[in-house]
Amino acid sequence: MEEHGVTQTEHMATIEAHAVAQQVQQVHVATYTEHSMLSADEDSPSSPEDTSYDDSDILNSTAADEVTAHLAAAGPVGMAAAAAVATGKKRKRPHVFESNPSIRKRQQTRLLRKLRATLDEYTTRVGQQAIVLCISPSKPNPVFKVFGAAPLENVVRKYKSMILEDLESALAEHAPAPQEVNSELPPLTIDGIPVSVDKMTQAQLRAFIPEMLKYSTGRGKPGWGKESCKPIWWPEDIPWANVRSDVRTEEQKQRVSWTQALRTIVKNCYKQHGREDLLYAFEDQQTQTQATTTHSIAHLVPSQTVVQTFSNPDGTVSLIQVGTGATVATLADASELPTTVTVAQVNYSAVADGEVEQNWATLQGGEMTIQTTQASEATQAVASLAEAAVAASQEMQQGATVTMALNSEAAAHAVATLAEATLQGGGQIVLSGETAAAVGALTGVQDANGLVQIPVSMYQTVVTSLAQGNGPVQVAMAPVTTRISDSAVTMDGQAVEVVTLEQ
């Protein structure tokens, strides 16, 4: 009995010794892992403690370009933005500065939301004190936004004034020499960042014009309504009244939008003072970007080329030419075109803000055939017609015709609805083939060429007959400048929503 007790005691001692040894080994491994993590952090090229990181020549490096130089010359806020942009380029990030203030604001909101989610995940998973600090040293109200783990967030807020002071001093060291200002007019800036007049919103223009008038006229108040106070450069077709409200006639409002009229006021003022160079910030950069940007749907596809879709691993869809197997275009979204399309010659370029502003296309000598087999594909037919309508063309003739071959009633309804929405008052829908014969027999309006021309105002009368035959539907469009964004078509300042009718 005694022997058994001694044996059991020895066995327990052995187990305890093994456990202690295992704990020592775990402590050693944990220490090694922590040391490795710290070493990895110290090896980061963006760490301020790293001797290889030097921001003394941040604006003199190859990362600096015309954009950063333009920003740096705009003042403290622009200097801070230029330093941030140059830092990102120095670290080989494939991004560019967004010069459009409206788009830049949307990007800021989206990225801050993404940063907050990433930071929450980091602090929870890693268990470290971490924050995100965003600063724009504008006076008198600097932007100082900080969020993250407590108490580090509170500590940073406590030293807000010190951080801002040190940042302004650091930026002042890198700021370029101030240029002599010989202009009577202020540069166009939004929140301290230069902006082109064509990218200013209506609200920004309404707030800017009174300030511009102070510089131009030298008076503290514009003197609205007094003809003696009206500048000689003020447009004749715009009343000399407070720009916060549009007091023009209805005819003038229909002809020119209020936003465009406000831009004309600013342009006239700067042209009068000989400072047109201040109207267009980053103009050279934007011109180069637009020249190399092409739309994702089609770019100079040969006439009568039949293409089919092919899904790529990255989620995009390629248009493969039938017969040769060559890739003619890559789509960001499979819904942009139906399954099989015969594409006429298209040359399409996008503007910087992602919208389209071109003349209606003329598909000269070509035909775009959309093969639809279900009523639900009518939306695709509408989208494709819209893309064809805004595809860029150098010049177009009056009465240009777009031919669409539709194989479903819903698609015919949808395309005719879009035609009604987009054609001007003098426009017409032209039917040919069996459809024209059927409608012509009913109405007696078929001409010698076998075509039936229907005014847009009579659309509701004949829409039910559009899909009875399988012949193509020709939509004759007069050239008109328009802007299409998503599913809305803007004409003369009024939005027309595209309605899709299904069976």
Curated annotation (Swiss-Prot):
Chain segments carrying region Required for transcriptional activation: 301-476
Family annotation (InterPro entries): NRF1/Ewg, Nrf1_NLS/DNA-bd_dimer
PTM comment, free text: Phosphorylation enhances DNA binding.
GO molecular-function terms, A-Z: DNA-binding transcription factor activity; protein homodimerization activity; RNA polymerase II cis-regulatory region sequence-specific DNA binding
Start and end residues of each stretch annotated as Disordered: 36-57
A cellular-component GO term for this protein: nucleus
Residues annotated with Phosphoserine modification: 39, 44, 46-47, 52
Region feature (Dimerization): 1-78
Keyword Phosphoprotein annotated: yes
Record localization: Nucleus
Glycyl lysine isopeptide (Lys-Gly) (interchain with G-Cter in SUMO2) crosslink location in chain: 139
Pfam families: Nrf1_DNA-bind (PF10491)
DNA-binding region positions on the chain: 109-305
Keyword Cytoplasm listed: no
UniProt short sequence motif Nuclear localization signal, positions renumbered to this chain: 88-116
Tissue expression remark: Widely expressed in embryonic, fetal, and adult tissues.
Keywords, sorted A to Z: Activator, DNA-binding, Isopeptide bond, Nucleus, Phosphoprotein, Transcription, Transcription regulation, Ubl conjugation
GO terms, biological process: mitochondrion organization; regulation of transcription by RNA polymerase II
Family under the similarity heading: Belongs to the NRF1/Ewg family.
Subunit structure: Homodimer. Binds DNA as a dimer. Interacts with PPRC1.
Function statement: Transcription factor that activates the expression of the EIF2S1 (EIF2-alpha) gene. Links the transcriptional modulation of key metabolic genes to cellular growth and development. Implicated in the control of nuclear genes required for respiration, heme biosynthesis, and mitochondrial DNA transcription and replication.
Protein's UniProt name: Nuclear respiratory factor 1
Organism, scientific name: Mus musculus
